[in-house]
Regions:
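Extracellular glycan-recognition regions
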Residues: 1-193
Length: 193
């Protein structure tokens, strides 16, 4: 595990506390990351606790939260700038905690799928390597099925870290722990470890 003390906030929440082992956040009202698609608006107000990563990396974190309102969300973000980023994790929609990923390259897309385990306690992993983004989720921190595989812009470095938003309210309490950031794991696509 690595320390969660030295991240840098984009849109620091009113209530947040970072220690060596965990980051606790309570979301502010009307926070979100989105660009244009369907809704026609741009929002760059979500909470993002960023660490710098080199060209090829893997990051993962455990997330605990009680998602209950529409669009409550928490997970990881990888960001180049306000127009090129991805956020992924659990997002509450249509009465369920869904596995969600939003890939943005000028405009946002949104891909979701049902999460069959407990959405209040999960792990999310992102790997960026050679222009490819791989997202995996886990219910136990040991088995990591694929959520998404897609192109992602190559860069010398990225910002990556915990992300949470509540577009419709304030007050989602999120605990991030078991943070890891390092070189890309380089595993085969169907290696779920």
């Amino acid at each position: 595990m690595q320390s969660l003390e030295n991240g840098r906030w984009l849109n620091e929440p009113t209530k947040a506390e970072a220690s060596n082992t965990e980051l606790s956040v309570t979301t502010d009202a009307n926070t979100d990351f989105w660009r244009e698609t369907h809704y026609g608006f741009v929002r760059d107000s979500g909470h993002f606790y960023a660490f710098q990563a080199q060209r090829d990396f893997t990051a993962q974190v455990r997330i605990q939260a009680q998602f209950k309102n529409l669009y409550d969300q928490a997970g990881l973000m990888v960001r180049l700038n306000e127009r090129q980023w991805v956020k992924t994790g659990i997002e509450f929609s249509d009465g369920y905690g869904l596995l969600s990923s939003v890939l943005t390259n000028e405009t946002s897309d949104w891909a979701t799928g049902r999460y069959d385990s407990d959405p209040s306690d999960f792990w999310i992993r992102v790997t960026v390597q050679s222009g490819v983004l791989r997202i995996q989720a886990s219910y136990d921190g040991r088995t990591w099925p694929l959520v998404r595989l897609c192109p992602f812009p190559e860069a010398d470095h990225y910002l990556v870290g915990p992300m949470c938003c509540t577009p419709e309210r304030a007050g989602l309490e999120v605990r991030f722990s078991e943070w890891r950031l390092g070189r890309a794991l380089g595993k085969e696509l169907h290696d779920l470890s």
